[in-house]
Amino acid sequence: RWLGTPIKTPRPSVPLASTIQEVDWISAAFLLVKKRVLEKAGLMDEDFFLYAEEVEWCSRIGKQGKLCIYGDLSAIHLQGEAINKDQQSNEKGYYGLYSRKDLQLMMSNHLRVRKQFGVGWFLFLLLNYTWGVLVYTIVGFIHRLITLRNPFGHLGKVFAFGKNVFRIWTLAPTIVRNKPHFYKLL
C-alpha cells in the first residue's frame, strides 16, 4: 500500500467511500450486477468452494465495464465466523499458512491466479510459495537463535506450511489443465 498509492495503482477494494469509486473487485457479500453483464461474463465459477471466487468473477465482469462502489449507499455486514468455528481457528483475516482453512485460502488464490492470469503466473506463484517454505525455515531458525529460543520450535508450523504447499502441488496438474473440478479441501 505504501508503494502502490504514490504510483496511483488501482485499489482492489475500498473500505469506505463518499462518492462513486472505481475498484478492481467488490466483496460478493453485497454485489449487484446487470443482467446483460451476467449474460456476457457468466456466473461465479463453480470450481471455487470458498474464497477468491468473487475476485475471479469481478475480473470477468470488469472486462464488460467498470466496477464501482457507491459511497452514498451502505449495507451492514457482520463478519462471518462460521468457518473459524468449524475449523477451530481463532485467526481473523485471510493470510494464514498452516491450517486447513489456510490451505483452502491458498488453493482458491492459486486457482484464481490460474483462471485470471494463466498458467505462467500460477506456476510462478506456486514456486514462490515453495521457495517460501525454505526461507521460512531458515529465517525462523535464525530468528529463534537470536531471540534465545529453541531454534527448532517453529518446525511444527514449517511442516504444516510445507504440507499445504505440497497439497497444492498435487493438484497443480488439474489446475493447469483448467478442466472443471470442485476444489473443496476443508
Give residue ranges: language-model regions:
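Short, flexible, basic/aromatic active-site loop/helix in glycosyltransferases
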Residues: R1-V23
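Transmembrane helix-loop junctions in multipass membrane proteins, especially transporters and channels
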Residues: T5-S13, F141, L145-F152
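Short capping/connector residues at structural and topological boundaries
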Residues: K8, A28-L31, E81
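A short, conserved alpha-helix in the catalytic core of glycosyltransferases
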Residues: P15-T19, D24-S74
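Aromatic-acidic/polar surface patches that form glycan- and anion
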Residues: E22-S27, L31, L50-Y51, Y98, ...
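Structural element of the ATP-grasp superfamily
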Residues: L38, I61, N109, V113, ...
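Active-site-adjacent helix/loop segment of glycosyltransferases
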Residues: K63-R149
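Membrane-interface aromatic/basic loop that binds lipid-linked glycans or pyrophosphate carriers
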Residues: R144-L186
